[in-house]
Design a protein with these regions (language model features):
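Short alpha-helical segment immediately N-terminal to, or the first helix within
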Residues: 27, 304, 378, 482-483
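Accessory DNA-binding and partner-docking regions appended to nucleic-acid-acting proteins
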Residues: 1-4, 340-341, 346-361, 367-373, ...
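Generic structural hydrophobic/aromatic packing signal, biased to beta-strands
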Residues: 270, 334, 375, 404-407
Length: 524
């Protein structure tokens, strides 16, 4: 009989749940509503995908991000899950076919935009089939106090109330204040929900802040991107003009870059995002205000060219890096001009004729100013950046994490003082020690294993190209790295690699095993 652990291993290829995931899965399977606040990259999707495969009926996932739906459904289909999405990126014929198949029971998981819940055709389908669970992703969009309020989210409750029997509900978000969480509970009418906030700590992310005058930022940006080699990254800018100028700057240095912002037409945005997902573009440059919903696990760096409006936005955007658990760098370039730009937008929002009462707009502006204050503190602090972020989100924080620019600057200063004293002592004794050779980084591969890893990348690229898939949907970088380290020689051994489920092992396993066998054989 299937259970959460067997589904996790068989379908997704993981031996164990991440912190917080198993409790959420158990509660949903027991019929208890859930409100989960989990940072970007913490594995929210597993929390509802696993129970969706164990519940008797269909799970509907409400998401505001069209591109994310496509990516998540694509990944599920690759893992052998019957999943589909329904949004305006489909033609009318495709929508009709998808709904027809949904009525016939083809799918276990269906992703929809919130507006789709109001469509008569979708409502008829939901009346005819058993809906076991409704999951609301990016649930903070339901709150006027959240940074991404969407009025269509307010009608989710009406849809749920219209169903023949009430499904269990899960609400997930990366960041939510107490006020926003209260709005989520109220507007979704969650019944005695299990509420959980998992750790916001992402140990694999290196945080860095750099003060730079506007005239210095292009040089700083180029230095950062060129240092990353061919690794994929995202650069966030505060205006569409800066996005376009930054793309031109990067392209002038032969860096494959593309833009993503609201002023581009939908086809261009979709093409640019696909180019990034399929590794035809190395760097995506996007506006802070325009959420990409990118689900690319091997993003190795995120650079904020401008300071975002608040730490909630910053952490969510920075969290796009390193979703595969491998080391990644998050750099913030800031200047006093950034603060003035954000204040301009706050004032503009306060004066906007949007139908809200003056006192409500004034309170919203006050809260925005408060959030900006903490964003500014983060940008200028001399103390541990990780500690500052964790403390802001209400979590116990270390005084020093050892993996941010402030901690390393303090350590390097101390090391320089020690080195200076040592050299002075050595000089007085008329001797100088030879510098020690640096030890290889923990977890680094041998030269032979690096060669094998590159061969595995090549196989993945070929297999993905044949199916017109992003490479990470075959296997992510962390999975290939573990293959290069452990060198499985059979399908059974391959199934012990994290991220290898049964369907993927059957579909792709032999191609990767042949490369590993050749590499091992050539060394003997």
């Amino acid at each position: 009989m299937e259970n959460p652990h067997s589904i996790l291993k068989k379908v997704f290829g993981y031996d164990s749940f991440r912190p917080g995931q198993e409790d959420i899965v158990s509660r949903l399977l027991a019929g208890q509503d859930v409100l989960a606040v989990m940072p970007t990259g913490a594995g929210k999707s597993i929390c509802y995908q696993v129970p969706a495969l164990l519940l008797p009926g269909i799970t509907i996932v409400v998401s505001p991000l069209v591109s994310l739906m496509k990516d998540q459904v694509g990944a599920l289909v690759q893992a052998g899950v019957a999943a589909a999405f329904l949004n305006n990126s489909l033609t009318d014929n495709q929508k009709a076919l998808m709904l027809h198949r949904a009525r016939e029971g083809w799918y276990k998981i269906i992703y929809v935009a919130p507006e789709r819940l109001e469509m008569p055709g979708f409502q008829r389908f939901a009346q005819e089939r058993q809906i076991s669970m409704v999951t609301v992703d990016e649930a903070h969009c339901i709150s006027q106090w959240g940074q991404d309020f969407r009025p269509s989210y307010l009608r989710i409750k009406e849809f749920v109330d219209s169903l023949p029997s009430r499904p269990v509900m899960g609400a997930f978000t990366a960041t939510a204040t107490a006020h926003v969480r209260a709005d989520i509970r109220t507007h979704l009418a969650l019944q005695a929900p299990y509420e959980v906030t998992t750790s916001f700590d992402r140990p694999n992310l290196y945080f860095e802040t750099r003060r730079a005058l506007p005239s210095q930022k292009p040089k700083e940006l180029l230095e950062l991107v060129l240092k990353e080699g061919n690794h994929a990254g995202i650069v966030y800018c505060s205006t569409t003009r800066q996005v376009d100028e930054t793309v031109q700057l990067l392209q002038s240095r032969s860096i494959r870059a593309a833009a993503y912002h609201a002023k581009l037409d939908a086809d261009t945005r979709r093409q640019n995002q696909d180019d990034f997902l399929y590794d035809r573009v190395q760097v995506m440059v996007a506006t802070n205000a325009f959420g990409m919903g990118i689900d690319k696990p091997n993003v190795r760096f995120v650079i904020h060219y401008n300071m975002p409006k608040d730490l909630e936005s910053y952490y969510q955007e920075a969290g796009r890096a390193g979703r595969d658990g491998q080391p990644a760098r998050c750099t913030l370039l800031y200047s006093g001009t950034d603060v003035r730009t954000i204040r301009f937008f706050i004032d503009k929002e306060r004066e906007a004729d949007n139908g809200l009462p003056a006192d409500v707009k004034a309170e919203a502006a006050r809260k925005a100013e408060e959030r900006l204050k903490y964003m500014t503190f983060y940008s200028t602090t001399q103390h541990c950046l990780r500690g500052f972020l964790l403390q802001y989100f209400g979590e116990a924080a270390p005084k020093k994490c050892g993996n941010c620019s402030c901690c390393l600057a303090a350590e390097q200063e101390a090391q320089l003082q020690v080195e200076y004293a040592r050299r002075r002592a050595a000089q007085s004794a008329d001797r100088l020690e030879k510098p020690r050779r640096a030890k290889p980084a923990a977890g680094s591969l041998s030269e032979a294993d690096e060669k094998l890893l590159n061969a595995l990348y090549a196989v993945r690229k070929r297999l993905a190209g044949k199916q017109n898939l992003p490479a990470f949907m075959v296997f992510n970088d962390a999975t290939l790295r573990e293959m290069a380290e452990k060198k499985p020689m059979s399908i059974d051994e391959l199934l012990n690699i994290s991220g290898v489920g049964e369907k993927k092992a059957a579909r792709y396993g032999n191609a990767f095993l042949r490369v590993i066998e050749d590499a091992v054989g050539s060394r003997e």
